[in-house]
Amino acid sequence: ANFDPSCTGVYDRELLGRLSRLCDDCYNVFREPKVATECRSNCFYNPVFVQCLEYLIPADLHEEYQAHVQTV
């Protein structure tokens, strides 16, 4: 996974990998090139990431992912 310089929190390779994989999966579903880049923008703190999260991840895990975003 590429390291996003906009992430200024904890550098946790595993967490960043999970967030990045969500963006990859989202891109694979929607096949829109901008999805992959926008999902990662602002260190995953953006509306595209939230849409991907809601579409791909069970609702009971949303808070966990949101906490990851705030960590990195």
UniProtKB/Swiss-Prot annotation:
Keywords: Amidation, Carbohydrate metabolism, Disulfide bond, Glucose metabolism, Hormone, Neuropeptide, Secreted. Hormone found in the sinus gland of isopods and decapods which controls the blood sugar level. Has a secretagogue action over the amylase released from the midgut gland. May act as a stress hormone and may be involved in the control of molting and reproduction. Disulfide bonds join 7-43, 23-39, 26-52. It comes from Penaeus schmitti. Belongs to the arthropod CHH/MIH/GIH/VIH hormone family. The modification Valine amide is found at residue 72. Its main location: secreted. InterPro entries: Crust_neurhormone_CS (IPR018251), Crust_neurohorm (IPR031098), Crust_neurohorm_sf (IPR035957), Hyperglycemic (IPR001166), Hyperglycemic1 (IPR000346). This is Crustacean hyperglycemic hormone. It is found in: Secreted. GO terms for cellular component: extracellular region. One of its GO terms (molecular function) is neuropeptide hormone activity. The keyword rRNA processing does not apply. GO terms for biological process: circadian rhythm; glucose metabolic process; neuropeptide signaling pathway.
